[in-house]
Curated annotation (Swiss-Prot):
One of its GO terms (biological process) is DNA replication. The gene is yabA. Keywords: Cytoplasm, DNA replication, DNA replication inhibitor, Metal-binding, Zinc. InterPro entries: YabA. One of its GO terms (cellular component) is nucleoid. Its main location: cytoplasm. Residues 45-63 have a biased composition (Basic and acidic residues). The keyword Cell division does not apply. This is Replication initiation control protein YabA. Zn(2+) binds at H94, C96, C109, C112. Involved in control of chromosome replication initiation. Inhibits the cooperative binding of DnaA to the oriC region, thus negatively regulating initiation of chromosome replication. Inhibits the ability of DnaA-ATP to form a helix on DNA; does not disassemble preformed DnaA-DNA helices. Decreases the residence time of DnaA on the chromosome at its binding sites (oriC, replication forks and promoter-binding sites). Tethers DnaA to the replication machinery via the DNA polymerase beta sliding clamp subunit (dnaN). It comes from Oceanobacillus iheyensis (strain DSM 14371 / CIP 107618 / JCM 11309 / KCTC 3954 / HTE831). Signal peptide: none annotated.
Length: 120
């Protein structure tokens, strides 16, 4: 095998490695998006189950409570602020105390995700 053939093979391998590296980067971005969506959906599911459980419990106790207390309880939802923060994070903004409100630039923030873990 001549020097030119070896050089061509190394050049081809370098090109293939570059393409694989690019594909790996694309997969990493897709995986990050999927993990973020999975995390958001898990939290949303948790809150919906919690609201459903409260709704079922309220149905049992509504007849025992005065009308004013029932209206107050249904008017303010306990997870409303959390849902707003989750929506802001989903829209691409930081919700952590370090960079609150600044754009995330399509990256996950461990401090923002830590906030979600603390509120479970």
């Amino acid at each position: 095998m001549g020097n030119r053939e070896i050089f061509d093979q190394v050049s081809d391998m370098e090109k293939q490695i570059g393409e694989l590296y690019e594909q790996l980067g694309d997969l990493k971005v897709k995986l990050s998006d999927l993990l973020e969506e999975n995390h958001r959906l898990a939290h949303e599911n948790h809150h919906l189950r919690h609201h459903l459980e409260e709704y079922r419990q309220d149905g049992d106790t509504d007849s025992k409570q005065p009308l004013n207390e029932t209206k107050k309880k249904h008017h303010t939802l306990p997870g409303e602020g959390y849902d707003n923060l989750a929506r802001l994070y989903e829209e691409g903004f930081h919700i952590c105390n370090l960079e609150f409100g600044s754009p995330r630039r399509n990256e996950d923030c461990i401090f923002c995700l830590d906030f979600f873990d603390k509120t479970k």
